[in-house]
Swiss-Prot record:
This is Down-regulator of invasive growth 2. Residues 11-26 have a biased composition (Polar residues). Forms a complex with DIG1, STE12 and either FUS3 or KSS1. The interaction of FUS3 with STE12 depends on the presence of both DIG1 and DIG2. STE12 is lost from FUS3/DIG1/DIG2 complex after pheromone treatment. DIG1 and DIG2 have also been reported to interact with CLN1 and CLN2. The modification Phosphoserine is found at S34, S225, S266, S270. Transmembrane segments: none annotated. Induction: By pheromone.
Amino acid sequence: MNKEEQEDPQQEQISTVQENDPRNLQQLGMLLVSPGLDEDRLSEKMISKIKKSRDIEKNQKLLISRLSQKEEDHSGKPPTITTSPAEKTVPFKSLNHSLKRKRVPPALNFSDIQASSHLHGSKSAPPNITRFPQHKNSLRVRYMGRMAPTNQDYHPSVANSYMTATYPYPYTGLPPVPCYPYSSTPTQTHAYEGYYSPMYPGPLYNNGIIPADYHAKRKKLAGRSPHLEDLTSRKRTFVSKHHNGDPIISKTDEDIECSVTKNSLSEGASLNDDADDDNDKERIIIGEISLYDDVFKFEVRDDKNDYMKACETIWTEWHNLKK
């Protein structure tokens, strides 16, 4: 421990001697003093950049001094900057750039415009919307009329011989059939070889008997529209399949793909639309709904919400007819 204590003061003396050395002080002084720029060693490009930086510095100082001044009105002469008495005064070029907008234009007064003015009938340009068709009334529901009941559309098979015998024959309204005598004949003898026993006669229908209201029904059917005749034929096939036990398939709804032309677009559509665009095609569902004897026809887009709305409108119109 004593040896270490003896060595410490010696080290402190050596450090103080080095700090007091005049050579070290001279080197520090040379480092602190700035000798400046030697123009002989600089190129013309470097000297021009230095001058530009000085001009920029002067302009910035001038702008700061102008913003700090409270008085806005000053003399029209451009201010001069005096950096030092040895240098010449450099005039500052005032630029008409303001940080604040001083000249605000007045508001337009539309109340002074007369009716005969050319600005009265002006309106804005149409909006540039997409080229998809704009359907204002996508739901189309129409009442087709009443269809005759089912039991009035079928006629007896005697009057209409062209009809098939798929319907059950009314056995109650047939006239009495005369019974012919039947006599048994020998069948094993040579004299009666090839002779067969006569068959029982079938029921004899009187073709001259026609229902009284048949001609009235024919006149009534002749005055119908072809659309209602199509409905009656569908109902007739439905009842025939129901009697025969065949599976019934409903074909009232039809999916029709129709192309919406450019004329069906709204007035606000863009004028730059292409006529041959593939987006102008849309699927439309056409169908019929019959409530008892009332028939409604509808045309809607291929959308569930539109179909439900069509059903609601048909339901309300049908209830209004019953009132």
